[in-house]
């Protein structure tokens, strides 16, 4: 009886993962795609199922070409993603067209899904984190990490790091003038100061500089970094002003050193 169960399970699994011989699944990413974010998530899911994908850069919005498994076709339907089943012959014609020197496009073969980390505070903020909202909707798995994980060398566990609303200079986004009495701002300052003390730093700016350096080392080691919003500027400013006190008293308790601007090395 047990042997029959195993045979049945194997048969069902083979049906689910049945390869559509000589066929491919084309996922357009131009205006014909009705659910772009879900399409990215579907491609990630396909990679996690040990299926390779071809990313057709600069072709119809960066479309995807996947192996023609019935399970992938089923997922496309479940996630309401626009797709086409095309023959291997048509897929090869597409590859040949993109490979022409006169065509400004490229094919990148994707083999494994990246392990993603999002650098974001664990506590609630008065704005939405666009990165986590997008990844959650797309059904792309990720971990939320912050200063503790970065300083404890856990960045090495990931392939891709996202930065969103963050001020690596220790000025809390320069919200002091407008929100210094807001409870969320006070709590943010208290938590940052507590974190700095925990890791032996006298100032939050020193803590954030240490985090920025760890992120720099992560990218030098081959890690991918995607920064947006205030993270793009403040990350560079923090690294460029190492050892320079350009923060006023409301941010670190003391004044600005003499002529800090002339000492910053971009």
Outline where the language-model segments fall.
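Positively charged n-region of N-terminal signal peptides that target proteins for export
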Residues: 1-6
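Helical hinge/lid and interdomain linker segments adjacent to catalytic or ligand-binding clefts
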Residues: 25, 30-34, 64-65, 69-74, ...
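Surface-exposed patches in mature extracellular/periplasmic domains of secreted proteins
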Residues: 53-59, 145-148, 248-252
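Cleavable N-terminal signal peptides
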Residues: 10, 20-21
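Sec/Tat-exported extracytoplasmic proteins
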Residues: 47-51, 120, 165, 222-223, ...
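Hydrophobic targeting/anchoring helices
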Residues: 21-129, 138
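An acidic, glycine-rich "communication" segment
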Residues: 228-266
